[in-house]
Amino acid sequence: MRVSVSLVLGVGLGCSSPALWAETESPAELEVLTVTAEAERAEGPVQGYRANRTASATRTDTRIEDIPQAISVVPRQVLDDLDSARIERALDFAGGVSRQNNFGGLTMFEYNVRGFTTSEFYRDGFSANRGYMNAPDSATIERVEILKGPASSLYGRGDPGGTVNLVTKKPQAERFARLHASAGSWDRYRSTLDLNTPLDEEGDLLYRMNLAVEDSKGFRDYADGQRLLVAPSISWQLDPDTSLLVEAEVVRNRQVFDRGTVAPHNHLGSLPRSRFFGEPDDGKIDNNNETLQATLRHHFNEQWSLRLASHYKHGHLDGYASENSSLAADGYSLRREYRYRDFEWHDSITQLDLLGDLHTGSIRHQLLMGLEYERYHNDELILRSIPSRNPYAIDIRRPVYGQPKPPFGRDDRNHEEVDAMALNLQDQIEFSEKWRGLLGVRFDRYRQDMNATRLNNGRFRETSSQQTQRAATPRIGVLYQATPEVGLFANASKSFKPNGGTDMAGKAFDPEEGRGYEAGVKLDLLDGRLGMTLAAFHLKKKNVLTADPSNPGYQQTAGEARSQGFDLQFSGQLTEQLRLIGAYAYIDAEVTKDENIARGSRLLNVPKHSGSLMGVYEFREGWLHGADAGAAVNYVGERAGDSSDSGFELPAYTTVDLLARYPLASNATLGVNVNNLFDRRYYERSYNNVWVAPGEPRNLTMSLTLNY
């Protein structure tokens, strides 16, 4: 939406002399002055660091300050300032989000929000992490939005901590082109092109193309990778009330599978960060993904509109890898497992939403009634050696590569089919200027069919399982706008997530169930330049799979966990020249019931304290006019390094990054980013003491950006 102001000035109206008034037959009219500004849309660009609208929390275009829930938005400008090729660094500024298993560096397989790990994240409201999709590329991302607390009432199956929704770049009315090329430490090279143009004079047909090409060796020995991304999109205003948006993305990714470093005797730091424990001649894992998405919107009138959207993705991953398995008693001989993977998956999702904007007396209702259907197929083949028979060991102090490959002793083949249907009902209620409410519920029907075959040491075993789960996940929230600058809110909601497999009796497990409670305050500071959200939360999860003590080798749904604490996120302009984004979180997350893990054990990779701050100053005068200079600080507290909280932990760390941009010409900008300025040795994440991901040493990136 555009906002226009036209001014017509009559000179004669400003004259007080009757004689002069009589001499003027008509007022003199100056040229019409039109001031045009682009109003923010929930799926559109953000000016600076502060977003004011979102669709992630309600599936409607709503002001963030009107939603009774904590929402963190990390806009495109942050990704550009960081010069980050992936989105994980943006999540450092969301508050309460930490890193988890990244599947050997190939994917954003799991992450953690408010203490609970999840593998669910979304792309324009569609589940984006079915299968083993490549880690999202920043080239296509307009904003990263983090919805805190259970999101099942809107998105279905998930975990109670929260979820991430990636809002992709959409075609715009303006014609522009942006070419960005960068080169950095360890022979990292990357180029992106963002091209946007109207295809007709009326501006009804718009086209956008995003391209990315990447070749990176990285700081880890032998762990290099290449990526090619092509992402075209086109929007068509069919008539004043109807629009169609079609988006596609093709990714070709080749990368070495790398489980990281190890911690002999549970101690980190004795080995070089660059040391690789796979085999250089294993080659790379190929991960090819295709995504196609279409959205049709139609407005029947001012009150009612319809949204019909469909999303399809396909992926194929295959390749060999030698992976860390376990350390021998001496702490230096690392047993390894040789694996071959061949995975292929298809996922299709269709959504139909009817939206209404009605009044009952003085009360306004924004209604959402939605249907969703998903069909997912996944086929996995894993061949693996058996370390207990063929250790395939390597000395971590003096690794010698090129050993003969051990034979495959185990053959696992899995086939999974999922059919899921859901009904969404939601009412955003405006009782008055000060009071707002939110009611929502989702009804899910989930059916999963699994077939698995295993050949282990010459013995063949086939298992099949089927489960059908039904769940109703409500949420309720209320917001009180105490003053124009202060809003108080509270909410409660539920989540569910199906558990795969069966118990000793062959019965499908009950799904995990979560509950979340949140209360907080939203602040609008410095005349609207800076926004801040502070929220306290209490989350519980039950029916977590744990070992069945009566039947070794089987599981039961007896585990429970709890997370509580508070988090803070702020973003905006401290002054007209200084933009800021920052976050802090205190999280107390622990096991409250488990057959194997002690009560009170910390949850994996969850720091009690974490915080971040980035500030960028824009010069407006002198020879530095148009230049930027900034810094970012990120702190992560110590964390449990394995799921049993056995005493192995990752130490706390603080990193400092610097950035600068200098305009060489009106359309050319030179950029410099220095990451980990003080070269701190740190560890981002772990799964156990032989799967530990070290952080990058100090590194430099130079970039050139051309705008047309």
Swiss-Prot record:
One Gene Ontology CC term in the entry: cell outer membrane
SUPFAM superfamilies: Porins (SSF56935)
Limits of the TBDR beta-barrel domain: 174-708
Stated induction or repression of this protein's expression: Is part of the operon cntOLMI that is negatively regulated by zinc level through the Zur repressor, which leads to transcriptional activation of this operon under zinc depletion. Highly induced in response to airway mucus secretions (AMS) treatment.
Knockout or disruption consequences: Deletion mutant does not show growth defect in LB medium, but it exhibits an evident growth defect after treatment with AMS.
Signal peptide: 1-21
Span of domain TBDR plug: 63-169
Compartment(s) of residence: Cell outer membrane
Keyword check for Transport: yes
NCBIfam families assigned: TonB-siderophor
Protein name in the entry: Metal-pseudopaline receptor CntO
Species, as recorded: Pseudomonas aeruginosa (strain ATCC 15692 / DSM 22644 / CIP 104116 / JCM 14847 / LMG 12228 / 1C / PRS 101 / PAO1)
